[in-house]
């Protein structure tokens, strides 16, 4: 759900436009509830309690939160988890927790912003400023937990900043064999720099970590909000620990049961559809240098993007021209929320009419967590690749080609960037944990699933599928043009539905549909 941070920094772009390992240690508990581990070998981990302290002395947390963690509402803690759940005595890692508390005695609400690879710690300031309502935060402490391998929780490392720049700027490999080889080389780089976390940053382990976090927070049940990829972690948790499910909201739902190439197919179609809305709106407003029907504008955009392969555009950084890969990344990033479409129109107009790729490069960098000095604030790029490669199982060549043909047929503009996902998994040098599966969560308390009708990254029908899989799933349909629904600007229908459920346990009425405000 990186669009939250993108929205938080989009004001800067608007200004630009106007100008042109250890063992677990006992800590002081918030609660004294005795919590039993699911197996005796894990009891020491479950006996931990989060020892909250001021964050100001933690330079890493301060950097990740742009200094906000020094404010009195923020507190920090660490929780120790086993590196391998199959062998809990074989080393440990630490998870970074940061909470935002406005009310004394409030319950903890754990959230995951998405990804995989998205840092909850890094996103916490923007989440409490723009996403969670004051009403919700009056009843809950908002707890950010970076999953294993991500952000400040034993981050997996693969590439240097310079190598990441090169990787992001390069056009995707064209053939199956090239994809496999590129994946193999990247995987070997991860194994060289992070031999343990390159093997143990899978979602199954991250989900089990969540239960130790629950215990460390002194809670019999976990209250949780997951956005995008965070819905997958939440669904896995509910299926594995149904009796520990408290109030669960899964917004922008992934279907946990489908293979990687089907995920790619859904996203290719979702972005292709939202791009059509964006082109039509930009044309009507006279904001883009494209003319004609939607299909004609898509063709013109595709032709222009192709020219960037041989002739990338100059930018404000003389050493970093705008390539096709970077331009596509920027445009897609701005499709996550229709409130950022104006920036996409301006960036495209600057690039096509003025031969200047500066705006689109800045957007692509913001989305990738690249800082002005050339470093990357988080390891989101590395973590995204590693986690997906560990989570998914590759399809055989025949099945993979079937999906590729469908993607190219149904998403002619963007489809090329979404095909042959299984080839990347197959080339990865670490065996997949194959964590994707159908979930039931038998016996769990009600789980609220939210799907937005024109969500480009997590299509609405995935929310329908997840709701059907979960025995206690309850679907809230939201009509809108963005990725995930809940935020302060979502309108009362959405925020009241979610807040009432989280605070009082009252589910929205069966079949309820909300409408996001039009931008």
Segments predicted by a language model, with ranges:
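Bacterial N-terminal signal peptides that target proteins for export
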Residues: 1-8
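Alpha/beta-hydrolase-fold enzymes
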Residues: 284-386
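Classical Sec-dependent N-terminal signal peptides that target proteins to the secretory pathway
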Residues: 11-13
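Gly/Pro-rich cap/lid or specificity-loop segments adjacent to the active site
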Residues: 29-326, 386-519
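C-terminal motif of bacterial Sec signal peptides marking the signal peptidase cleavage site
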Residues: 15-19
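Bacterial signal peptide processing site
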Residues: 21-24
């Amino acid at each position: 759900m990186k669009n939250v941070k993108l929205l938080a920094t989009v004001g800067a772009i608007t200004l630009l436009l106007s100008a042109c390992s250890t063992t677990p240690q006992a800590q002081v508990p918030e609660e004294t509830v005795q919590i039993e581990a699911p197996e005796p070998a894990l009891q020491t981990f479950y006996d931990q309690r989060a020892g909250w302290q001021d964050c100001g002395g933690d330079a890493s947390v301060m950097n990740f939160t742009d200094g906000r963690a020094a404010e009195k509402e923020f507190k920090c803690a660490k929780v120790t988890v086993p590196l391998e759940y199959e062998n809990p005595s074989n080393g440990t890692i630490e998870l970074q927790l940061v909470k935002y508390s406005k009310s004394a005695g409030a319950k903890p609400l754990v959230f995951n912003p998405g990804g995989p690879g998205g840092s909850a710690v890094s996103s916490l300031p923007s989440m409490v400023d723009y996403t969670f309502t004051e009403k919700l935060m009056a009843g809950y402490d908002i707890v950010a937990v970076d999953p294993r391998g991500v952000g400040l929780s034993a981050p997996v490392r693969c590439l240097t900043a310079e190598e990441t720049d090169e990787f992001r700027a390069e056009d995707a490999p064209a053939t199956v064999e090239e994809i496999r080889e590129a994946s193999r080389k990247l995987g070997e780089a991860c194994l060289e720099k992070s031999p343990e976390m390159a093997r143990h940053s899978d979602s199954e382990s991250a989900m089990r970590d969540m239960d130790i976090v629950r215990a460390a927070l002194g809670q019999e049940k976990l209250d949780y909000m997951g956005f995008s990829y965070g819905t997958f972690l939440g669904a896995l948790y509910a299926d594995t620990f149904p009796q520990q499910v408290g109030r669960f909201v899964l917004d922008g739902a992934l279907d946990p049961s489908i293979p990687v190439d089907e995920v790619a197919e859904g996203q290719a179609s979702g972005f292709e559809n939202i791009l059509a809305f964006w082109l039509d709106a930009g044309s009507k407003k006279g904001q883009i240098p494209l003319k004609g029907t939607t299909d004609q504008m898509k063709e013109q955009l595709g032709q222009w993007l192709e020219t960037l392969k041989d002739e990338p555009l100059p930018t404000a950084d003389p050493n970093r021209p705008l390539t096709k890969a970077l331009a596509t990344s920027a445009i897609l990033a701005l499709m996550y929320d229709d409130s950022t479409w104006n920036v996409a129109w301006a960036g495209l107009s600057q690039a096509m009419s003025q031969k200047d790729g500066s705006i689109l490069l800045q957007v692509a960098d913001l989305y990738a967590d690249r800082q002005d000095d050339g470093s990357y604030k988080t390891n989101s790029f590395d973590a995204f690749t590693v986690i997906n490669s560990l989570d998914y199982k590759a399809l055989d060549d025949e099945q993979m080609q079937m999906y590729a043909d469908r993607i190219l047929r149904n998403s002619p503009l963007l489809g090329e960037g979404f095909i042959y996902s299984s080839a990347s998994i197959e080339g990865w040098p670490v065996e997949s944990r194959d964590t994707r599966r159908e979930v039931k969560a038998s016996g769990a308390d009600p789980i609220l699933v939210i799907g937005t009708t024109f969500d480009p990254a997590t299509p609405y029908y995935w929310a329908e599928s997840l709701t059907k899989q979960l025995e206690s799933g309850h679907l809230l349909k939201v009509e809108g043009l963005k990725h995930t629904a809940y935020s302060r600007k979502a309108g009362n229908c959405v925020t009241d539905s979610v807040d009432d459920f989280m605070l009082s346990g009252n589910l929205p009425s069966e079949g309820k549909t909300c409408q996001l405000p039009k931008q």
